[in-house]
A protein has these predicted regions:
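Sec-dependent signal peptide recognition
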Residues: 2-10
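Cleavable N-terminal signal peptides
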Residues: 7, 17-18
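N-terminal leader/signal peptides at the extreme start of proteins
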Residues: 13-14
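Sequence context surrounding c-type heme c attachment/ligation sites in exported
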Residues: 21-149
Length: 149
């Protein structure tokens, strides 16, 4: 009886840990998706003319992006050791073998955003801003993001 309780308890703890790990992976993915919303759904679409240029939306997108990027280091502190179920992209285990190098990819993104913030005034300057920020996102993805499907 006592043994059964211990076994069931251990199993429950195991399930809890797996769920917590999936939750961490989801949080990390959600942060990236939120960044994508600002940079791709708003800014990139405007550069392509898919949606009309809107100064307020540009300024908001850059402000949101800045806030999100500042959360990357902390959000990726814990290794979830699993991917989000059905995700297209996953986090490389290299992140947690070399977290300092991973973190070093963040300030260049912040600098690219700071450099263009308040200076974007039209589609042409938005295009330049998009490229300079996106190139810095890519610098991290090349090493630390895995394509799963
Ligand atoms: C310091 C590293 C790093 C930086 C900087 C970074 N990312 Fe990521 N990104 C990752 C990792 C790791 C993943 C894969 C794991 C995940 O999705 O959480 C990822 C995944 C993504 C995904 C795929 C999400 C999905 O599952 O569909 C998008 C979109 C994305 N990032 C956008 C951005 C944008 C936009 C920026 C720049 C503003 C950016 N990222 C900056 C590390 C980074």
């Amino acid at each position: 009886m006592r043994r059964t309780i211990v076994v069931v308890g251990t199993l429950l703890l195991g399930v809890g840990a797996v769920m917590a790990q999936q939750e961490i992976a989801v949080q990390q993915d959600n942060l990236m998706r939120s960044q994508a919303k600002s940079l791709y759904t708003v800014i990139q679409k405007m550069t392509k003319g898919d949606i009309p240029y809107n100064q307020k939306a540009v300024d908001e997108a850059l402000t949101n992006l800045e806030a999100d990027v500042a959360k990357i280091a902390k959000t990726f502190e814990v290794n979830p050791k699993q991917d989000v179920v059905n995700a297209k992209f996953g986090a490389s285990q290299k992140i947690w073998q070399n977290k300092a190098d991973f973190d070093s990819k963040i300030p260049p993104v912040q600098k690219a955003i700071a450099d263009v913030k308040g200076k974007v005034k039209d589609v042409a300057s938005l295009k330049a801003a998009y490229t300079s920020v996106n190139d810095r996102c890519t610098d991290c993805h090349e090493t630390y993001r895995l394509k799963l499907k």
